[in-house]
Amino acid sequence: MRLRRLFAIFALLAVAASAAAAQAAADPTVALLVDLIRVNTSNPPGNERLVAELLAPRFKALGFDVKIIQSPDTAKAVIVARLKGDGSKRPVLLSAHADVVGVERDKWTVDPFAGVVRDDQVYGRGAIDFKGGMAVFARAAMMLAERKVPLARDVIFVAEADEEGGGGYSTAWLAREHWADIDAEFALNEGGWIMKGDDGRVRYVSISTADKSSVPLTVTAHGTSTHSSMPRPDNAIFALSRALAKLSAYETPIELTPAQTQFITALARTSAPPMSGYFRDLIGPDPVRARHADSVVSRDPLMHSLIRNTIAPVIIQGGFRNNVIPGSASANVNLRLIPGSDLGAFMATLGRVVGDSTIELKTSAPIYTQTAPSSENTDLYRALVNAAHAQFPGAEVTPYLFQAGTDAGAWRSRGVPVYGIYPYPIDADELTRMHGNDEKVSTASLKQGTEMIYRMLVEVAGRR
């Protein structure tokens, strides 16, 4: 009898869980994100054309002018969906990349490409970066058509390729070959954060107006290649290890732009003591207090990367047989530089840090060229600020320097202001999962983000 009751309870719980998941998936933004995650666009190879083909009929059904731009790589394509306004104002553009980074499948507890909805969370590669943002942007634009909002300007949605690397058909190619299709007065992309505190409430909304530059650095050590039974002092792998250890121990100095200072000021207002005091000291005039504040604030990886240039080894190469000492070993290192940084001076500093003339430090051109920060004095920025305040009362809304890079440079380099946001509230745990394992975003956050971006679009594009 007890077993029957237990089975009955388990059955009821299973039905309830299934019903809750179905209810969450019924939300249009959640449902769209699930569909997007199920299209595996890991880059390489990308296969972004599949996303364009998924979205095209949905936009067409709502009256959007839809164009699929095919790149020379048949697997890579861009969708441009335009909802026409009366033309009295120039277009506003929403841009989201369709590709995602790959996964370490054995470290996930769910299929990363199944779009699992569990416990009011959508799991899958791209849930945060950036198919979640794509779903929010797309649904907000679609809602304008569904609700027949009169528009003073065109609203353009773009799902582009190769943001995560792996090919040559990023927004730089798109702008060079098809600028007329994506020209706008201003644009919204990925970037800033809507961060929740421990109590689950949104503390701040940061809107990025600039990105760090990404600079690939190769560190190479040379030595004598010989039999592994006869090790020599000039072992290339040991030399590379010593060089990387020195780079790891080097703490780059604090560098603050106006956007960073505004952001940290906002954190000082929203944080409880003693963190509020540390944030004030970080941007204060006393260098001793600033250094101490840095030692505390920088325990948060996001804050550490925000206020300085960073050095991150990502790939190590060396050796090819167990019984051969290789003649060289190298490491790929990712440098992230704050706008205005002097790359030559920074490289000279790294050379002094390594302190070994036999170690070769070689950079290639920055992936994301530096451009001036986008102005905060635009209708789009003001509309996003207003929408954020309306959606998250009491939260600080502040400009922000994005600690990573985006593909916004294609527009910024042509004088088009671009603002960045991951348009859903997340917490520190969810942020860590981005590009990591069991990436997820909550269904409630997706709904809130869609409402916020819709509000923004009505204000900036609606006809008054």
Language-model features, listed with the residues they occupy:
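N-terminal secretory signal peptides that target proteins for export/translocation
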Residues: 1-3
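Metal-dependent amide/peptide-bond hydrolase catalytic core
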Residues: 23-24, 192-449, 454, 458-464
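Acidic, glycine-rich active-site loops and adjacent beta-strand->loop/helix elements
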Residues: 74, 98-100, 159-167, 190-195, ...
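N-terminal helical capping/dimerization or prosegment-like subdomains
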Residues: 23-105, 328, 332, 343-344
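A glycine-rich helix N-cap at a beta->alpha junction
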Residues: 176-192
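Active-site metal-coordination/substrate-binding segment of hydrolases
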Residues: 89-156
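Bacterial N-terminal signal peptides
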Residues: 7-18
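Extracytoplasmic/secreted envelope proteins and their assembly/folding machinery
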Residues: 30-36, 49-52, 56, 134, ...
